[in-house]
């Protein structure tokens, strides 16, 4: 086991020199991007050794190196948990990041601050590794917050754009809501377990209280963009495409799901939390799939597909299958990163055009990108024997066997069909239709820094699911026996979505009227959620505050304190002090009447 822990530590420490290199030699600019890429490639190669050893030995390890602080009742140590979840995820995250780093050398070549950009991406990866390998809640919280901070910095990378700054602030605010739940769970475990070590927390909470689990679910919902806390995810597309690829594939958005995977010894003993997680995930996966159907921005289509797949992972947690959730995280990382890379290649070659209605005919001009986009879209839809099939088919098959909410499982199947529909729509608009972009545009996809990572991830989208399911099984594999109609449910849902998308695309081209029906606006306006939460509620609150402030000002200052109050006090004071009323006309009339009477009597 010493060899196992040593190689794992070497994997983690090999990522530190590229960060310190900029501090030692700030003028090292030309060779730094390739140095970072080589460091991550080396870390990936080294990580295969401890992962292979874990597959052979099947024994998890907890490494405690250094005691941070000790109080009378609490000891905090630097502790790493090297188990099935962390050792499976680690090489996948490193491989994805290596490919994205190499893709960034092409995509961000003209950026003057590319060195800092790559360093931020590397720190983003390191914070995610800290989160994944943490064995205590404080260390996990450090990785959790680090992922959030780095996402803020990377989404707002193009800080001169107002939309990018707004999207970054939106992401950090929605994640702060989730952090409230995490901090609540931290405080509860400290008060009731007197420890933040995961083993002790699990041991002392066999019948867990609902409050900390609700806090953990809120944290996962914020970080993994579940319904209600989801608007930041499509807005995050304002960042550079490499950021979107890394954020959506193997870092921030899967951190919430990974948190629930880590705490599955507690959630499996709480039927209420499992039911709530299942329903939340099912609603999210359907809502995101509906929103993706009508989007025209290619990156937002992929973003909503991420939200839909995150909902599917939450469904998997809700049916108490954490190993399947991790399997879907790993397979999803390959084809989601590939989808973003293909989108970035298309956007870059079409002079930053992201509207799929202004694309088309790219099948011949960009053959490799078109092939990769098709493979990744089909893997997303769950086409048989691609990587997505091995996880999605198992999830739906296991869900059909469970005794939980039928309606949640039904809408999950509907969302699976819609996944095939919007994936097919994106392929048809970008690759097969007539070109809708200006002819003078020069398209070139022959750069090696573009081709190599796309080919690498394309192979992952083809074979990763097969390799992971056959070589890294869970420690206790359930024997699945289902009737044929349930076994084919996932495949039938996928094929139904593909056929519906083809039929709707044909009918849409034949329509005489171009006015969309009213139901269209629910999808294109994202369920009116941003309009209500980001526009209506702030407008009403500001209007109410304005009216209250003005009315209170008028009532207190004008009527109660200054002008009218002074005049009222002066009037009452004059009445009290003086017996004269100041009625000049009455006084003059009382003088005039006796005078007239006297004159009449004399005359």
Swiss-Prot record:
InterPro entries: NADH_DH_su5_C, NADHpl_OxRdtase_5_subgr, ND/Mrp_TM, NU5C-like, Proton_antipo_N
Entry's EC annotation: 7.1.1.2
Major location (coarse): mitochondrion
Highest rank taxon of the organism: Eukaryota
Gene Ontology, cellular component aspect: mitochondrial inner membrane
Compartment list: Mitochondrion inner membrane
Topology with respect to the bilayer: Multi-pass membrane protein
GO molecular function: NADH dehydrogenase (ubiquinone) activity
Disulfide bridge positions per record: none
Coiled-coil portions: none
GO BP term, pick one: mitochondrial electron transport, NADH to ubiquinone
Catalytic activity: a ubiquinone + NADH + 5 H(+)(in) = a ubiquinol + NAD(+) + 4 H(+)(out)
Transmembrane segments: 4-24, 38-58, 89-109, 122-142, 171-191, 211-233, 241-261, 273-293, 301-320, 325-347, 366-386, 405-424, 457-477, 488-508, 524-544, 582-602
Keywords, sorted A to Z: Electron transport, Membrane, Mitochondrion, Mitochondrion inner membrane, NAD, Respiratory chain, Translocase, Transmembrane, Transmembrane helix, Transport, Ubiquinone
Top EC class of this enzyme: translocase
Subunit structure: Core subunit of respiratory chain NADH dehydrogenase (Complex I) which is composed of 45 different subunits.
Function field: Core subunit of the mitochondrial membrane respiratory chain NADH dehydrogenase (Complex I) which catalyzes electron transfer from NADH through the respiratory chain, using ubiquinone as an electron acceptor. Essential for the catalytic activity and assembly of complex I.
Family according to the record: Belongs to the complex I subunit 5 family.
Protein name, UniProt field: NADH-ubiquinone oxidoreductase chain 5
Organism field: Pongo abelii (Sumatran orangutan)
């Amino acid at each position: 086991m010493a060899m196992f822990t040593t190689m794992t530590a070497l994997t983690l420490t090999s990522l530190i020199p590229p960060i310190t290199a900029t501090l030692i030699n700030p003028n090292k600019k030309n060779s730094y991007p390739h140095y970072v890429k080589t460091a991550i490639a080396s870390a990936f190669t080294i990580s295969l050794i401890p992962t292979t050893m874990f597959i052979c030995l099947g024994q998890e390890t907890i490494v405690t190196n250094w005691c941070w602080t000790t109080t009378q009742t609490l000891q905090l140590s630097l502790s790493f948990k090297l188990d099935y979840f962390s050792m499976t995820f680690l090489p996948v995250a490193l491989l994805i990041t290596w490919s994205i780093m190499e893709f960034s050398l092409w995509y961000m070549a003209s950026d003057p601050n590319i060195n800092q950009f790559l360093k931020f991406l590397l720190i983003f990866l390191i914070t995610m590794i800290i989160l994944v390998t943490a064995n205590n809640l404080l260390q996990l919280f450090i990785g959790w917050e680090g992922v959030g901070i780095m996402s803020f910095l990377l989404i707002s990378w193009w800080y001169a754009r107002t939309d990018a700054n707004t999207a970054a602030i939106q992401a950090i605010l929605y994640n702060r809501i989730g952090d409230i739940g995490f901090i609540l769970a931290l405080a509860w475990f400290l008060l009731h377990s007197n420890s933040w070590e995961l083993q002790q927390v699990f041991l002392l909470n066999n019948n867990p209280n609902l409050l900390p689990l609700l806090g953990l679910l809120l944290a996962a919902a914020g970080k993994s963009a579940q319904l209600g806390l989801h608007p930041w995810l499509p807005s995050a597309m304002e960042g550079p495409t490499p950021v979107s690829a890394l954020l959506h594939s193997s870092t921030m958005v899967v951190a919430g799901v990974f948190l629930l995977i880590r705490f599955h010894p507690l959630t499996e003993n709480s039927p209420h939390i499992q039911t709530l997680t299942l329903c939340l995930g099912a609603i999210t996966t359907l809502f995101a799939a509906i929103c993706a159907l009508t989007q025209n921005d290619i990156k937002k289509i992929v973003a909503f597909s991420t939200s839909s797949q995150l909902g599917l992972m939450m469904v998997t947690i809700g049916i108490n299958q954490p190993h399947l959730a991790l399997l879907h995280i790993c397979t999803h990382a390959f084809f989601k990163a590939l989808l973003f890379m293909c989108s970035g290649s298309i956007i870059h070659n079409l002079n930053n055009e992201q509207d799929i209605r202004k694309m088309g005919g790219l099948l011949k001009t960009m053959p490799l990108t078109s092939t990769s986009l098709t493979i990744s879209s089909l893997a997303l839809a769950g086409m048989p024997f691609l990587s997505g099939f091995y996880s999605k088919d198992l999830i739906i098959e296991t869900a059909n066997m469970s005794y939980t909410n039928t309606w949640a499982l039904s809408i999950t199947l509907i969302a699976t069909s819609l996944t095939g529909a919007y994936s097919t729509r994106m392929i048809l608009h970008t690759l097969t239709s007539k070109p809708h972009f200006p002819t003078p545009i020069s398209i070139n996809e022959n750069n090696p820094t573009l081709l190599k990572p796309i080919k690498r991830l394309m192979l992952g989208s083809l074979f990763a699911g097969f390799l992971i399911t056959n070589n890294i099984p869970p420690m206790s594999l359930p024997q699945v026996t289902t009737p044929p109609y349930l076994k084919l449910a996932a495949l039938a849902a996928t094929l139904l979505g593909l056929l519906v998308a083809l039929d709707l695309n044909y009918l849409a081209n034949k329509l005489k009227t171009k006015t969309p029906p009213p139901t269209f606006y629910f999808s294109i306006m994202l369920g009116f959620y941003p309009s209500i939460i980001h526009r209506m509620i702030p407008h009403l609150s500001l209007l109410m505050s304005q009216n209250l402030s003005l009315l209170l000002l008028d009532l207190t200052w004008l009527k109660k304190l200054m002008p009218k109050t002074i005049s009222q006090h002066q009037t009452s004071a004059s009445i009290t002090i003086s017996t004269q009323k100041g009625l000049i006309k009455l006084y003059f009339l009382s003088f005039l009447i006796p005078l007239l009477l006297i004159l009449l009597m004399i005359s």
